[in-house]
């Protein structure tokens, strides 16, 4: 199953490769930096407990509305058009106190779908579909998934158990400006510290640079490549594990 949204830094190209690194004996699965949840949707290795988390409140609201109010969300999205004016209107109204959660979810979905590179900031001129035909399948997949909006350290400590598998896809080092939520150099170190103290297991996606390799030099590091979504050519990444 594919994600229902594109996302900056999304793992649609590497999802199967990441899933191939999954162990077979985990009882809880936690996506710490959920984003578009490409790995969650692509995996057929479902755990009894599954958690999706993201710091972006608009994104979390979209996931929750799709899970709990799918039909109402679909009806709301029907009223939106793929146009520059509609995009600007959605941007302006997203933070308005007069909008409902379902309206905000619909507007954020539109902003993701018709923006350039799913950045939600600039209108993408290429025609994009606002079809919601896959929403019912997504709703069913999310039935057993807990949806959280927590700081990554708080989340990891809350769900950490020996039988837990954490998938972490943080904002990449030196590319943090592309993400809506602030992520600092100190946060990269903070993530490293909490993963070093983990009782469970983790799989971590990162860009391949010297800073990352030095930070995680004590763990298993595998180099991979994917096509760059925002420019031509390939992008070097690493998959890091503690098992």
Q: Where are the regions that the model predicts?
A:
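Anionic group-transfer/hydrolysis microenvironments
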Residues: 33, 56, 171, 207, ...
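Conserved SAM-binding loop
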Residues: 63
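Short alpha-helix immediately C-terminal to the canonical SAM-binding loop
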Residues: 60
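Long, positively charged, glycine-interspersed low-complexity recognition regions
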Residues: 184-243
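SAM-dependent nucleic-acid methyltransferase catalytic core
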Residues: 1-14, 24, 57, 69-178, ...
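Conserved SAM-binding motif I beta-strand of class I
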Residues: 49-54
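A general structural motif
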Residues: 25-29, 47, 161-163, 199
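S-adenosyl-L-methionine
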Residues: 1-34, 38-40, 45
């Amino acid at each position: 199953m594919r994600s229902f949204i594109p996302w900056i830094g999304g793992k649609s190209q590497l999802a199967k490769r990441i899933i191939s690194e999954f162990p077979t004996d985990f009882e809880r699965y936690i996506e710490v930096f959920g984003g578009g949840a490409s790995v969650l949707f692509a995996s057929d290795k479902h755990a009894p407990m599954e958690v999706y988390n993201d710091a972006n409140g608009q994104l979390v609201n979209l996931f929750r509305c799709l899970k709990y109010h799918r039909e109402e969300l679909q009806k709301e999205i029907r009223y939106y058009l793929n146009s520059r004016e509609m995009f600007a209107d959605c941007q302006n109204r997203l933070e308005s106190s007069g909008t409902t959660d379902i309206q905000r979810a619909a507007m954020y979905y539109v902003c993701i779908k018709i923006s350039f590179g799913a950045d939600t900031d600039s209108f993408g001129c290429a025609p994009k579909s606002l079809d919601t035909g896959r929403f019912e399948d997504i709703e069913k997949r999310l039935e057993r998934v807990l949806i959280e909006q927590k700081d990554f350290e708080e989340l990891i400590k809350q769900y950490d158990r020996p039988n837990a598998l954490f998938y972490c896809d943080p904002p990449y080092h030196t590319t943090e400006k592309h993400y809506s939520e602030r992520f600092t150099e100190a946060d990269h170190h903070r993530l490293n510290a909490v993963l070093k103290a983990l009782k469970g297991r983790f799989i971590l996606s990162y860009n391949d640079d010297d800073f990352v390799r030095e930070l995680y030099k004590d763990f298993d590091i595998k180099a991979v490549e994917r096509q760059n979504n925002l420019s031509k050519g390939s992008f070097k990444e690493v998959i890091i594990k503690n098992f």
